[in-house]
């Protein structure tokens, strides 16, 4: 069963999982592109997976049927999933995978409201969640809009874009992503090669789904989860996420937890969780970029939790 979504950095992910034995957790199952490839490559691994998108889960249940009892799938986020697993399951986890991005199918499906040309204005990963992009665009104050465009879209003209939205909705509700994109403007920002609409959509999507909080909670849960001898592989798609992962991996690799500026280490200098395996993030090869232009912004970082 072919996935409607092209998994990014697949060869790189497979290279890290090829020799593992035990369980691996896919924190963002999606359409099971990475997980099905890992299971096919390595018969010594079993999958425990979670996702919040019921459409993706239903697709993946069928896609992963050939692997039978090697697969468990939960409609959950990662931090909730940990509480559902037995101590034996957790102690046998040898790999954790998270692909922190929107799937191609979600972007391309008109009713999900992620794409610039969508007739819907939604952007929810979990369609059972009440809060949507419509609520942000039509309900947020000027200051709230400026905050998300500045902090999550890294837009220099955040106030100008917020003004455009306020002025437009004063004439009537904004009901589609296509309408919103035209209000913001789709011409590329000079020197950045991307339109303000794309960055504003990113900001709204992050706000709607609490994506940065979800990522932080994911990393917190891994840190406190009691995992041993376990790979942590995380794919991000923009600088905000990558920065969070990079800084957390640095913290985990730090053996000294003494306060900054202290003259002599007094903590024992043995507090590292493990080691960073990717000093610089892995990015898409030229051949992958030729096949999937959406892989351009993907970055893979890998950490090995010690045994």
From Swiss-Prot:
Subcellular localization is given as: Cytoplasm
Q: Which reaction does it catalyse?
A: cytidine(1402) in 16S rRNA + S-adenosyl-L-methionine = N(4)-methylcytidine(1402) in 16S rRNA + S-adenosyl-L-homocysteine + H(+)
Q: Which GO terms describe its molecular function?
A: rRNA (cytosine-N4-)-methyltransferase activity
Q: Name one GO cellular component term.
A: cytoplasm
What biological function has been recorded for the protein in this entry? Specifically methylates the N4 position of cytidine in position 1402 (C1402) of 16S rRNA.
| Family as reported in the entry's similarity comment | Belongs to the methyltransferase superfamily. RsmH family.
**What is this protein identified as?**
Ribosomal RNA small subunit methyltransferase H
The encoding gene is rsmH
């Amino acid at each position: 069963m072919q996935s409607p979504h092209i998994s990014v950095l697949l060869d790189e992910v497979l290279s890290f999982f090829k020799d593992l034995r035990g369980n691996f957790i896919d924190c963002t199952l999606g359409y099971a592109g990475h997980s099905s490839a890992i299971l096919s490559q390595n018969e010594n691994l079993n999958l425990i997976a979670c996702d919040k998108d019921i459409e993706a889960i239903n697709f993946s249940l069928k896609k992963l049927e050939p692997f039978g009892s090697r697969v468990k799938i939960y409609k959950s986020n990662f931090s909730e999933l940990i509480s559902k697993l037995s101590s034996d399951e957790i102690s046998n986890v040898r790999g954790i995978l998270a692909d922190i991005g929107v799937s191609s199918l979600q972007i391309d499906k008109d009713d999900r409201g992620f794409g610039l040309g969508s007739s819907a204005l939604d952007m929810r990963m979990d369609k059972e969640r009440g809060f949507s992009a419509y609520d942000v665009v039509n309900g947020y104050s000027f200051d709230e809009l400026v905050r998300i465009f500045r902090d999550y879209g890294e837009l220099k003209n955040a106030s100008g874009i917020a003004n455009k939205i306020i002025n437009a909705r004063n004439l009537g509700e904004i009901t589609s992503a296509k309408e919103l994109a035209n209000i913001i403007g789709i011409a590329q920002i000079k020197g950045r090669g991307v339109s303000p609409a794309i960055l504003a959509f990113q900001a709204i999507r992050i706000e709607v789904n609490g994506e940065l909080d979800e990522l932080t909670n994911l990393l917190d849960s891994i840190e406190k989860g009691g995992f041993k001898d376990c790979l942590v592989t995380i794919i991000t798609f923009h600088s905000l996420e990558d920065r969070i992962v990079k800084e957390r991996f640095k913290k985990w690799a730090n053996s000294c937890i003494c306060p900054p500026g202290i003259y002599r280490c007094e903590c024992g200098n043995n507090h590292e969780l493990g080691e960073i395996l990717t000093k610089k993030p892995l990015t898409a090869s030229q051949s992958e970029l030729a096949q999937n232009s959406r892989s351009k912004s993907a970055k893979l970082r890998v950490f090995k939790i010690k045994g």
